[in-house]
């Protein structure tokens, strides 16, 4: 059994993609165009708990994998299980790329334009940090167009708060999804177990409904403005 090797700062620096490396891996030999970039490659996202900085925040990284279609992931560091902003992100994520057919990204990329078969957004909260990301697969020649459409949907949440009707509908939908999910006893048990490990008490579905009801449009917009900042997002493209 080999012992785990702790990466040195020099090794981390060597393995971190640079703009020159990205340019080499881009078919044109140039850095991605402004249309494809998520933001300033020099921008860094810092964890408030561990003083960890992301060296790829704001970059678009293209990896040539000779795949049948392009696989694209856009993401950033998000919130841990104890962060008050987690619940607004929970609702926002469901509206943007949740399992519902009316999810904004599904409508924009699949239903209205037929560019993808699968598109989804995901949030994961850990004990000390969290992640939020978007994934979609499309034909290679449609990547730029898909990225523009994704950016357009993100900007909508950043620029304008939800109306009372939109917020009410979103809450009603996610509470319905929670109710249906409770019928899956295995996932229900696992979820309750995680809650007990993190908080020391079992999850209460009625309390979860109350937390959803407490979410405001202003909270959702604030989370969108923080996480959807193009200088914060990293884009990874396999094609």
Feature-to-residue mapping (PLM):
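M16 family metallopeptidases and their MPP-like homologs
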Residues: 72-79, 106, 110-159, 164-214, ...
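Long, charged low-complexity polyampholyte tracts
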Residues: 90, 225, 236-237
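His/Glu-based metal-binding/catalytic segments typifying zinc-dependent metallopeptidases
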Residues: 9-10, 14, 24, 29, ...
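Short amphipathic C-terminal alpha-helix that caps PH/PH-like domains
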Residues: 1, 92, 150-154
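Low-complexity, intrinsically disordered Gly/Pro/Thr-rich segments
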Residues: 216-225
């Amino acid at each position: 059994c080999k012992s785990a090797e702790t990466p040195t700062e020099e090794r981390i620096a060597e393995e971190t993609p640079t703009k020159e490396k990205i340019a080499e891996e881009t078919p044109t030999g140039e850095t991605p165009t402004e249309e494809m970039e998520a933001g300033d490659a020099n921008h860094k996202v810092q964890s408030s708990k561990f003083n960890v900085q992301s060296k790829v925040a704001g970059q678009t990284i293209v990896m040539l994998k000779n795949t049948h279609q392009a696989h694209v992931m856009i993401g950033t560091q998000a919130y841990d299980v104890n962060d008050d902003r987690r619940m607004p992100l929970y609702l926002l994520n469901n509206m943007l790329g949740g399992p519902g057919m009316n999810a904004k990204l599904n409508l924009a990329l699949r239903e209205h334009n037929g560019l993808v078969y699968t598109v989804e957004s995901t949030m994961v909260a850990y004990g000390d940090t969290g992640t939020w990301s978007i994934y979609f697969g499309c034909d290679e020649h449609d990547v730029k167009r898909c990225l523009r459409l994704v950016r357009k949907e993100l900007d909508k949440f950043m620029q304008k708060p939800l109306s009372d009707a939109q917020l009410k509908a979103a809450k009603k939908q996610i509470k319905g999804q929670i109710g249906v999910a409770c019928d899956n006893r295995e996932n229900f048990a696992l979820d309750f177990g995680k809650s007990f490990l993190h908080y020391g008490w079992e999850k209460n579905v009625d309390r979860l409904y109350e937390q959803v009801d407490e979410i405001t449009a202003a909270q959702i917009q604030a989370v969108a403005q923080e996480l959807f900042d193009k200088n914060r997002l990293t884009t990874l493209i396999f094609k």
